[in-house]
């Protein structure tokens, strides 16, 4: 499933907040910024968040 730019922005913000609050990163990196770590997780496909899209009837 390809993410839209809006879904990426929402997931990036939520994941960055989780990491800055003490959640463990799912990747190994030398970055200190939670935003950069979250972005790398999204690029590698290892972010533990998934968007829920409404089903069209």
From Swiss-Prot:
Q: Say which enzyme class the record assigns.
A: transferase
* Nucleotidyltransferase recorded as keyword: yes
Domain of life of the organism encoding this protein = Archaea
A single GO molecular-function term is: DNA binding
Catalyzes what?
Answer: RNA(n) + a ribonucleoside 5'-triphosphate = RNA(n+1) + diphosphate
State which Enzyme Commission number(s) the record gives. Answer: 2.7.7.6
Q: Name one GO biological process term.
A: DNA-templated transcription
State the InterPro entries in the record.
DNA-dir_RNA_polK_14-18kDa_CS, Pol_omega/Rpo6/RPB6, RPB6/omega-like_sf, Rpo6/Rpb6
**Gene3D superfamilies recorded:** 3.90.940.10
Localization, UniProt: Cytoplasm
Q: Which SUPFAM superfamilies match?
A: RPB6/omega subunit-like
Write out the entry's keywords from A to Z. Cytoplasm, DNA-directed RNA polymerase, Nucleotidyltransferase, Transcription, Transferase
Gene Ontology cellular-component terms for this entry are: cytoplasm; DNA-directed RNA polymerase complex
UniProt key word S-adenosyl-L-methionine: no
**Assembly and binders:** Part of the RNA polymerase complex.
Function noted in UniProt:
DNA-dependent RNA polymerase (RNAP) catalyzes the transcription of DNA into RNA using the four ribonucleoside triphosphates as substrates.
Protein family: Belongs to the archaeal Rpo6/eukaryotic RPB6 RNA polymerase subunit family.
Q: Give the protein's recorded name.
A: DNA-directed RNA polymerase subunit Rpo6
Q: Which source organism does the UniProt entry give?
A: Methanocaldococcus jannaschii (strain ATCC 43067 / DSM 2661 / JAL-1 / JCM 10045 / NBRC 100440)
């Amino acid at each position: 499933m390809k993410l839209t730019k809006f879904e990426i922005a929402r997931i990036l913000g939520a994941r960055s907040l989780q990491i800055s609050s003490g959640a463990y990163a799912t990747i190994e990196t030398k970055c200190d910024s939670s935003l950069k770590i979250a972005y790398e997780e999204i690029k590698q496909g290892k972010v533990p968040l998934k968007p829920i899209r409404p089903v069209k009837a």
